[in-house]
Structures are given as structure tokens and as C-alpha cells.
Design a protein with these regions (language model features):
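N-terminal Rossmann-like NAD(P)+-binding subdomain of aldehyde/semialdehyde dehydrogenases
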Residues: 1-37
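Conserved small-residue-rich beta-alpha loop and adjacent elements
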Residues: 22-86
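Short acidic loop-to-helix transition motifs that present clustered carboxylates
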Residues: 24-25, 76-80, 99-107, 248
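Conserved NAD(P)+-binding/catalytic subdomain of aldehyde/semialdehyde dehydrogenases
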Residues: 92-179
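NAD(P)-dependent aldehyde/semialdehyde dehydrogenase
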Residues: 178-293
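Internal helix-turn-beta structural module
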Residues: 280-334
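Single conserved hydrophobic/aromatic residue that forms the stacking wall/gate
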Residues: 336-345
Length: 345
């Protein structure tokens, strides 16, 4: 799993280029990509030890070149979970603490006698962790405001109800308030999926959680056309979107609001969440309208710089600056830019 996450993050990192360009003779503008200097990675382990979350946060920060990676996780059944701690260490964490909940993220953000504060917090958590990150945002950066996990299945008659039901319940079992939505243009498939959900719930070990979530937050939406399915999917902007149709690539081309797409019946959300290599820290509550999920670029800051190489360029830029300062009414800036230009004449 870590090999897959690392390989994809390394490929993504290669798409982030630094830049230097001469926009006018003697005027050089550029930007540098600098890793965040200290990151705190929170890995949940209260109800279930979320080993995959260590892969997604620690490994990705390591690929980005973060010099100091701090990882915390709550005790699992009274002890540090060995699988989680091992994943943190293998992923590249420099410091590991058994400290859970809002105490964990608070300690990383504010610091303690033994933990130096970090610059950024990443990783999922329960409602208390999410609220702690919200209140700490500003003092530190965060990856995103994550709510309960969400899933959407977009399907047509090319698949059966069993696979749709399995995908829906696979996320519904994560929590009592995890939305699971299906969009289809096949009434037959919709009815078949309802029946399969009832059947699977009877044998599912996590029946209590999954059935409550499906009862309160589950729905199947019947549409007339693929265009209507697309419109509804973009409106809902779900975290996980499983597309199983004869037009998968069309949805890939036209979907604009989502956390991550899982294309085709072979590409199930569970594997995508855990081992396939893309990051599972994704936007929820329609945040996919304006942001993507955690990726190597989240750990990279792009800083601009500028330099003027000739007196002629400095004079020209100074004249432009004087005019704009006068227009805006900033007299101090006007005097500064005017004097700078005059000194070079």
C-alpha cells in the first residue's frame, strides 16, 4: 500500500515545476516550491485502527520533502496499535506519539513541554477532531474540513444490484451518519439494489451502523438521461463517486465536483481508500465544488520572487508604480516609487 501511495505521490510531485521568466527586458519574475517545514499527521484508531490513514498522510508528506513529520494516534484497546505505529515509522514519521482526539491535534498545533508545535495539521478524525482543527485553523494550516464519509454510485443497466448494494453499504458501515447515494437511469437496477441492500444487511457484521446510516442518509435517485445523472452528481458533490456505466470516460470528462472518482466495476471504493495509491483524505459536505483532496501539493508552498536587473527596467517599473499609486491615493507609495525612479535617471 505504501509503495502505491509513494509512487503516485512522486509522480504528482514531478508535475509541480518551479518558474523563472523575464516578463520585460530586465524584469525577472519567478516562483519557488518549498515544503511546509513541520507537519502533524493525525491517524484515528478509536473504533478501528485506521492504518491506511498513516499511509495517506505520512507517506505523502515524506515525498513532499517535509523536514519534520509528527504523527499521533490514540491508544487502541489501551495500548499503541502496533500496525498503526509501524505504518507511521515505515512511512517516514520523525516523531510518533500515542495521543488521541482533540488532545492530539491540539498538542501538535500549540506544542507541549515535549512536543514542538507544527505548521500544518492533516488527517481525518471524529467530530471532536474536526472541530479542533477548525478552531486551530489560522494558527496552523490544515488539509481540509472533513465530515462523515460519503459515497455515491452512478450506475446503469451494465451492472447488477448486488455490486451497487455492496458499494453503498461498504461506506455506510463507517458511521451512523455516512450518506450513501445511488444515481441511475434504470428502474430495474434501482429496485434490484433495494432488495440486495435488505439481503446484505441481514448478514453484515456491521449491520447496526450500516442499517442506521442507510435508513437516515441513504437514497436512490432515478433519472431519465445520462445528462440528468451528471447534473445531479455534480450538485451533490460526494466524497467518493463510483461510476459503473457504459459511459465511464464521459463522466470522467464532465464531472466537475467530487472528492475522487472510481471508474468501472473493478475499481471499488474500498481498495481506492486503502491500497490503490490515490489519497483517501477527501472533501466532504460538497467541498468538492472548490477543493480537491489531500495530495503532495498540499505540503508544498509556492512562493514568488522578483528582481529588476537594469536601471532602465527599474525606471520604467517605477513610473508605472507612481501612476497606480496616484490613482489609488497612496501618497507614501507614490513618493517611494517616484523617488526610486528619479534616483535612476
Amino acid at each position: 500500500a505504501q509503495k502505491q501511495v509513494r509512487s503516485f505521490a512522486e509522480a504528482q510531485l514531478k508535475t509541480l515545476s518551479e518558474l523563472e521568466v523575464e516578463t520585460h527586458p530586465g524584469v525577472i519574475l519567478g516562483h519557488k516550491n518549498i515544503p511546509v517545514q513541520a507537519v502533524g499527521c493525525y491517524v484515528p484508531a478509536g473504533k478501528f485502527p485506521m492504518v491506511a490513514s498513516a499511509h495517506m498522510s505520512v507517506v505523502t508528506a515524506s515525498v513532499a520533502g517535509v523536514p519534520r513529520i509528527v504523527a499521533t494516534t490514540p491508544p487502541f484497546k489501551g495500548k499503541p496499535n502496533p500496525a498503526v505505529v509501524t505504518a507511521m515509522k515505515m512511512g517516514g514519521a520523525h516523531e510518533i506519539y500515542v495521543l488521541g482526539g482533540m488532545q492530539g491535534v491540539g498538542a501538535m498545533a500549540i506544542g507541549t513541554e515535549t512536543i514542538k508545535p507544527v505548521d500544518m495539521l492533516v488527517g481525518p478524525g471524529n467530530a471532536f477532531v474536526a472541530e479542533a482543527k477548525r478552531q486551530l485553523y489560522g494558527k496552523v494550516g490544515i488539509d481540509l474540513f472533513a465530515g462523515p464519509t460519503e459515497t455515491m454510485v452512478i450506475a446503469d443497466e451494465t451492472v447488477d444490484g448486488e455490486i451497487c448494494a455492496t458499494d453503498l453499504l461498504g461506506q455506510a458501515e463507517h458511521g451512523y451518519n455516512s450518506p450513501a447515494v445511488m444515481i441511475t437511469n434504470s428502474r430495474k437496477l434501482a429496485e434490484e439494489t433495494f432488495k440486495e441492500i435488505d439481503r446484505i444487511l441481514e448478514i453484515l457484521p456491521t449491520k447496526e451502523t450500516a442499517s442506521t446510516s442507510w435508513r437516515d442518509y441513504g437514497e436512490i435517485i432515478l433519472c431519465d438521461t445520462y445528462e440528468e445523472m451528471l447534473s445531479k452528481a455534480n450538485e451533490i458533490a460526494s466524497e467518493h463517486v463510483q461510476v459503473m456505466t457504459k459511459k465511464d470516460d464521459w463522466f470522467l470528462e464532465n464531472m466537475t465536483s467530487y472528492g475522487a472518482l472510481f471508474l468501472g466495476a473493478r475499481t471499488n471504493v474500498a481498495n481506492g481508500d486503502k491500497v490503490i495509491g490515490t489519497n483517501h483524505t477527501l472533501p466532504t459536505k460538497k467541498a468538492g465544488r472548490y477543493t480537491g483532496g489531500l495530495w503532495v501539493g498540499k505540503f508544498i508552498k509556492t512562493h514568488t520572487y522578483q528582481k529588476i536587473m537594469t536601471d532602465e527596467a527599474a525606471t520604467l517599473i517605477g513610473e508605472y508604480g507612481s501612476r497606480l499609486s496616484h490613482l489609488e491615493g497612496f501618497i507614501g507609495c507614490l513618493l517611494y516609487t517616484s523617488d526610486a525612479a528619479d534616483d535612476l535617471r
